[in-house]
């Protein structure tokens, strides 16, 4: 999954979270808004992360388009990055800090990998 999926409704959010849960796939979600310059600035960096971490599903959520999801997950500032496993938020990072986001994504994806013992 080397791309960022744009979430445009609560239904699409629920669909992708459910799919990821069924496939044991971690989710990194970027909550953004068009009026938030730091958030918009992070979009290309977020796409780069999605390209480099193919084991995770990367979702982008415009809080003005999908208010109910942002509200349900208590997203109050942009940008907010949420890390979900099995449909549950495991970590949250608020702010446009590329180094910290990359570090968190790396640790999160590594810890989410399933080890298969033959």
UniProtKB/Swiss-Prot annotation:
Cellular compartments per GO CC: cytosol; extracellular region
Tree of life domain: Eukaryota
Tissue: Ubiquitous.
Keywords: Cytoplasm, Isomerase
Record's subcellular location: Cytoplasm
GO molecular function: protein disulfide isomerase activity
All copies of domain Thioredoxin, residue ranges: 2-110
Pfam families: Thioredoxin
Keyword Phosphoprotein (UniProt): no
Principal cellular location given in the protein's record: cytoplasm
Alphabetized InterPro entries for the sequence: Thioredoxin-like_sf, Thioredoxin_domain, Thioredoxin_H-type-like
PANTHER family the UniProt entry points to: THIOREDOXIN, THIOREDOXIN-LIKE PROTEIN CXXS1
Function comment: Possesses low disulfide reductase activity, but efficient protein disulfide isomerase activity. Does not possess deglutathionylation activity.
Family designation: Belongs to the thioredoxin family.
Name of the molecule in the record: Thioredoxin-like protein CXXS1
